[in-house]
Amino acid sequence: MWILIYLFIIWSSLRTWVTAVDSTTTVGDDLNETVSASVWPTMSPQMTVAFRSQRDVMGNLTIDQLPYVGLNLRRVLLNNETSMVNEGNNTRLLTLFKSMLSSEANAFVLDLEQYNNDLRVVDTTLLFSDVLIALQSFIFSTQNNLYANIIVLLLNISAPELDSTEYRHQNQTLNTTYILDKNLGNGFIYKPTDLQSDRAKNNTWNIYGKSSIDGWPTLGSVLYEQKKRLVIGELTDFFNETTAPYIFPHDVFHYEQGNSTLDCPSTVEGLTDLSSIHWRFLDSLFNSVDIKEYISCGLSPIISNSAYVNNVTQLADIIHEGSVWSWDSDQPSVTQSTSKSGSSSGTLEAYNCVLLYYFANNETVTWRVGNCYNSNIGLCRYENMAFRWLVRSNKATYFDFDSYQGSKCPDQYSFNIPRSPLEQRSFIAYMRNSSFSDTQIWIDLNSISVSNCWVSGGPYASCPYEKVISKRNFVTMMVPASVCSFALLCIVVYLSVLRVPIYDNRKNWRRVINKISKSELEGVPS
């Protein structure tokens, strides 16, 4: 019986241990997991964490207001300077395209032409279906909360040289729905019908709040609830709603080439007006300096630098400068634990909270990791107003600035963070108008729960990639169970080895009992 109890205890402890290990997602271990990129430079663990945390911060932004960094594939990949095009090396072209998908680029302009009731990539023998198969493979390999992101595919369709009757006939016989269903699958595509459904359910927003007329769903809704990964749009006027129901028409997107006609806003009114324009793309030549400025002005750059096709590293640097608009160049620091420690001066240290550094001389900001136990001022936002900020003058540690006991932000304000380049630009305008000098400000972003998992929601926010328990709490949970198991084991061993004394002296007890029984009288007393 004791053996069975002991085995049950051991089984329970092992089950708890296995459950905890299986349920814990250590984000640091996932830093080394990268999508296959045989040509494109692999993202470092630091870049991976920065890009992922930035995506998570933008989770409540609508997909039309996200900052995309894209590539014009015909100019970058398929220009005349590319020997691959002249050689007709389709395999290498697809390999490079797959590598580009695994970079930080998340928008692509693809030029297609009609070819025998099919679509073919201009200046190549590649079919549109070949590109879709490569895209499907990438989406399958990244269909999880760690790596999933929205991809925008913008199509330039070249019409065949036919008279109007033949053109209209070929356009109607071209079955784009079949091509997309067969080679990609419609489950990953966010379609015009999905947008209509979201608007009917009042699940869309614009800059002013919920809107069923011109609103769009949030990134979190599209990625995690609907499991959609791809938005396909047309830049020409080749398709219609009947022939291409999966593709958004050209008038949905604000797409410009060369120079932008949109002014870079510097006031809240200008920022609000710009935000009312959906999907703002600028197709032009960029370098690693000016691309950050265009991003901060609310535009999504489409890189058309044909000279960089043979210098992939330089092109990758430009994409990185544009895609990471928040963190400093050497941030965030990749750590292995979140446990607090004491410095030589006796103060507590936990470098798991984020400070926004404001530099007044050039009016720039950047994010850096700071010690959560240091006292700093914090950033507050007014209700759901995207561009209305307040910096509190009273200093506090990260844990005290926004805690269960209350927030340091006043009523109708909440501890917050700039979620996009435009919101960060509005914050800079606020700091300039308020005549702030260089300063460091707490923002609502930390990795207190799990190392390298940067989340918003205050110091007690949990990591979305960790289901049950973290490494830090694992030892705390296992120690009591292990001690109890060891104590019960000792008791079981003791009872199994050491017999009860009455059985140990059985002969002596029998002799005593016999002696006593002889002195007893038999029969009934008279």
From Swiss-Prot:
Compartmental location: Membrane
Side Cytoplasmic, residues: 499-526
Glycosylation sites: 32, 60, 80, 89, 156, 171, 175, 202, 240, 259, 311, 362, 433
One GO term describing the cellular component: membrane
PANTHER family (alphabetical): MAINTENANCE OF TELOMERE CAPPING PROTEIN 6 (PTHR35518:SF2), MAINTENANCE OF TELOMOERE CAPPING (PTHR35518)
Native source species: Saccharomyces cerevisiae (strain JAY291) (Baker's yeast)
Family stated for the protein in its record: Belongs to the MTC6 family.
Entry keywords, A to Z: Glycoprotein, Membrane, Signal, Transmembrane, Transmembrane helix
Lineage, uppermost ranks: Eukaryota, Fungi, Dikarya, Ascomycota, Saccharomycotina
Keyword Signal: yes
Gene from which this protein is expressed: MTC6
Residue ranges that the UniProt entry lists as topological domain Extracellular: 21-477
TM spans (from-to): 478-498
Domain of life: Eukaryota
Record's protein name: Maintenance of telomere capping protein 6
Functional description taken from the UniProt entry: May be involved in telomere capping.
Membrane topology: Single-pass type I membrane protein
Signal peptide: 1-20
Pfam families referenced in this protein's UniProt entry, alphabetically: TIM-barrel_MTC6 (PF25506)
Broad class of the protein's primary localization: membrane
